């Protein structure tokens, strides 16, 4: 057994465990405070979200855009930690994050992910890869020259702003009619995203979380939308203080 040979890179394990737990609870919040039974379509959708964020990272790497690299790495942590939870449950997800810091994302991580997935013949392979991707996302943030925990918190706080209260929606649309406000918000979300290169969002609708008194907007594929209350993470401000 090798001992006292490798230099340890410090990571706040508890912080990243709490971040993953935040993601798990955040997704439950979108579904009335309960975790659903995961079906095949949900796994396909969540894997798609991971792929989308890995693509953002690869594009940022080509441009050496540090803001977008950090944003994408944090987003990959968010979507992959939930995918790991879907495969393994909460206890195992948090246990994976006890691993020491390893390597970082390659500059072609999106291409690498696609190539690897094309060889898979068993769902277990994607499950294991998802755990690796989650840790790579964490380690990419930790090994950057920037304040990794501030960046992660900024992204988590930004995600929380996707869940408006009734009061916030009424204020945005200057009305006392919540049904009208919801209708206008759904239309606005579709309009804002009509020209996305990846394709427009369709079938946008809202659900109400009775327990936590917030609204959540989804498209017809189950992706959580960014309503008018969404606050984009200001990563540029954080790295400017480096």
Model-identified regions with their sequence ranges:
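Flexible "arm" and connector segments at domain edges
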Residues: 1-242
């Amino acid at each position: 057994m090798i001992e006292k040979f490798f230099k340890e890179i410090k990571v706040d394990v508890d912080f990243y465990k709490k971040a993953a737990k935040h993601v798990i609870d955040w997704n439950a919040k979108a579904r009335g405070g309960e975790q659903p039974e995961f079906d095949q379509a949900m796994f396909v959708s969540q894997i798609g979200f991971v792929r989308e964020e890995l693509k953002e990272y690869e594009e940022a790497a080509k441009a050496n855009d540090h803001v977008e690299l950090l944003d994408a790495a944090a987003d990959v942590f968010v979507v992959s930690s939930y995918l790991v939870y879907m495969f393994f449950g909460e206890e195992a997800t948090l246990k994976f994050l006890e691993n020491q810091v390893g390597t970082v994302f390659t500059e072609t991580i999106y291409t690498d992910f696609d190539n690897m997935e094309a060889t898979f013949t068993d769902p277990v392979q994607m499950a294991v890869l998802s755990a690796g991707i989650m840790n790579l996302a964490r380690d990419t943030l930790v090994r950057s020259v920037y304040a990794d925990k501030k960046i992660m918190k900024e992204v988590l706080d930004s995600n929380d702003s996707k869940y408006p209260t009734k009061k916030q929606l009424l204020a945005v649309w200057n009305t006392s009619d919540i049904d009208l406000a919801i209708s206008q918000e759904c239309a606005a979300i579709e309009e804002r995203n009509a020209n996305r290169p990846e394709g427009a969002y369709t079938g946008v609708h809202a659900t109400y979380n009775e327990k936590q008194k917030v609204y959540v907007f989804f498209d017809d594929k189950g992706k959580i939308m960014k309503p008018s209350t969404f606050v984009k993470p200001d990563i540029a401000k954080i790295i400017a203080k480096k």
